[in-house]
Amino acid sequence: MVKDILAPGLRVVFCGINPGLSSANTGFPFAHPANRFWKVIHLAGFTDRQLKPEEAEKLLDFRCGVTKLVDRPTVQATEVKLHELRSGGRNLIEKIEDYQPAALAVLGKQAFEQGFSQRGIAWGKQKIAIGATMVWVLPNPSGLNRIKTEKLVEAYRELDQALIMSGL
């Protein structure tokens, strides 16, 4: 089981779709060697060094957290069922209402659209919010995603810069 890393007062909570098998086996988020999450959040400015999956709890030192839409591990996120994403979206809203981070970053456009019953959304900041929490949709850092690392860093950096401009 991959546990959430959450606390009140975070700048951002990154929300993955669901754990891959590497994460399920180790208990650490974004654990597959091909997953670029740890590299991307470092290069985008969220951490002062590249953390390892087993150091996930240290995200709290940088006022960052992680959660997921669906607890069930799969080989690919495409194996997650629509009803799981919808249920996960409802559960995620409750978590965000409880912890009230400045921003929620859902990592994947299709997962966001299905989990939040939205259509035709763009990358970046969304029109909806959860209380005072800004909602962003960023590309998923999975190694299965063909987007170049530089583009991932650029998208994540846009969120980091928006938080800095907000005084966070």
Swiss-Prot record:
Record flagged with keyword DNA-binding: yes
Organism of this sequence: Salmonella dublin (strain CT_02021853)
Record localization: Cytoplasm
Matches recorded under PANTHER family: G/T AND G/U MISMATCH-SPECIFIC DNA GLYCOSYLASE, G_T MISMATCH-SPECIFIC THYMINE DNA GLYCOSYLASE
Family assignment from sequence similarity: Belongs to the uracil-DNA glycosylase (UDG) superfamily. TDG/mug family.
Matches recorded under InterPro entries: MUG/TDG, MUG_bact, Uracil-DNA_glycosylase-like, Uracil-DNA_glycosylase-like_sf
Organism superkingdom: Bacteria
Originating gene: mug
Assembly notes: Binds DNA as a monomer.
SUPFAM superfamilies with a match to the protein in the record: Uracil-DNA glycosylase-like
Name of the protein: G/U mismatch-specific DNA glycosylase
GO biological process, one term: base-excision repair, AP site formation
